[in-house]
């Protein structure tokens, strides 16, 4: 197994773990802090189905969903996540500037973020988008593009949380990104 596979564990245990937490500690909501949770969408489908099959009265959300991954989610998967009581996820939209997205090698486009956002309209799943500003060479016009993207995402889906724009220095991105 790869290190990521070892870390992600056997999916059959996660719904069981939720059930244990519900029974033992009366947990009503679980927050999963895993940037790689959504990498394997088949695994995510199995987890959501396992939670649904157990009919647990537990909602859950995930810190960590790459914008590429949310763009690949099918409507069927999104509906399954919603039925399994997934209430949200955090994803980095980063910038409204195509040039900046290319510069930081994010492997997403602005349109990809816009299209993925629309998929969650009408569900109980609340995407939280994070943004970063003040990249080296970023112009005021590019910063305005990011602000405009925030407003566009909110216009298209009133059920989102547009995170604040975090300055590049605080984001902890290394200079190696730009070499």
Where do the protein language model's features map onto the residues?
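Radical SAM [4Fe-4S] cluster-binding motif and immediate context
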Residues: 1-127, 135
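Short, well-ordered amphipathic alpha-helices
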Residues: 17, 47-49, 146-158
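Flexible glycine/acidic-rich beta-alpha junction loops that bind and position SAM and/or redox cofactors
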Residues: 42, 99, 103-104, 133-141, ...
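Catalytic cores of alpha/beta
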Residues: 76-77, 136-153
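Short acidic/histidine-rich active-site segments
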Residues: 130
């Amino acid at each position: 197994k790869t290190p990521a596979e070892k870390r992600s564990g056997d999916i059959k245990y996660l719904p069981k773990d939720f059930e244990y937490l519900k029974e033992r500690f009366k947990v009503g909501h679980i927050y999963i802090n895993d940037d790689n949770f959504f990498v394997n969408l088949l695994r995510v489908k199995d987890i959501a189905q396992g939670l649904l099959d157990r009919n647990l009265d537990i909602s859950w959300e995930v810190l960590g969903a790459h914008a590429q991954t949310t763009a690949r989610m099918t409507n069927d998967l999104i509906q399954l996540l919603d039925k399994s009581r997934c209430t949200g996820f955090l994803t980095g939209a980063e910038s409204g500037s195509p040039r900046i997205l290319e510069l930081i090698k994010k492997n997403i486009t602005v349109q990809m973020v816009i299209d993925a956002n629309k998929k969650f309209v009408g569900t109980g799943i609340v995407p939280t988008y994070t943004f970063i500003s003040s990249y080296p060479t970023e112009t005021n016009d590019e910063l305005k593009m990011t602000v405009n993207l925030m407003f566009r995402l909110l216009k298209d889906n009133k059920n989102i949380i547009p995170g604040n724009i975090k300055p590049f220095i605080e984001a902890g991105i290394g200079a190696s990104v730009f070499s």
